[in-house]
Amino acid sequence: RDESNGEVKLTIYPGGVAGDESAVIRKMRIGQLNAASLSTSGLSYIVPEFAAITHIPLLYNSDKEKDYVREQLSPELIQKLEAKGYIFIHWGEVGWVRYFAQSPVKVPDDLKQHKLFIWADEGTDIQMYKTLGMNPVPLAATDLTVALQTSMVTAFSTPPLIALGNQWFAGAKHMTDVKWAPLMGATIMQKKVWDQIPPKIQELILTASKKAEIELTEEIRELDDKAVEVMSEHGLVAHKVTDEEYAEWEAIVNTVYPYIRGKLVPEEAFDKVVQLRDDFRANHLSK
């Protein structure tokens, strides 16, 4: 709004006011909403390949690996998004997903003893976790606090910032210090609405959005670790794992990769991100 001197008006519906991501997408399709910030899970309802960036556990060891894969995949994702009638505005991220539980979780067998919260609208994950021998409990995120208090749920996974912001860690004070996967998303807009905005203002919006993306990404990455420090001051115990324990997580993930490849992530996209990750590691290690 500021960049356009009021020519573009923006009304924001924060914190799930407009419904969950599937509801937001439905509202965009019928024109009730013009734009949205969605996680890669939400974006994958529109372009399934978005899931490849974040839905493969233990794919990345660092932000650099993740950034490389995302940068290489972005042009294709943006093109597919536009073909579906949406314009890509900017990326966003919330940090690295970790497991939080009411007792220490150092290896997968520890997690199998817990009742694990999963998002109610991600039905495909239920079968995946059951295949791994876990006990998934699908719920709305708004029910998680009470579920933890009553032990209906005893473990969940989320980035530290969200665990802190929602105070969920108060009900599960043991964090497994393994970066399971990044939580990321993007802001998109209906193309037919975007096309109504004058080109000069489109350019201003994209420039401002890119600047915000860079600044917020840097800030979020600092706050990801800071959130763990703050929670630790209020009773959280962060459990580091040994190389042997980490190998157990890798082993269980490898058993579920065939399920993820094809069911959660399109096969071609799955293979592509793994290859991109491997290429980055080979080039990085060779220098």
Where are these regions (language model features)?
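N-terminal secretory/targeting leader peptides
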Residues: R1-E65, L73-S74, Q79-K287
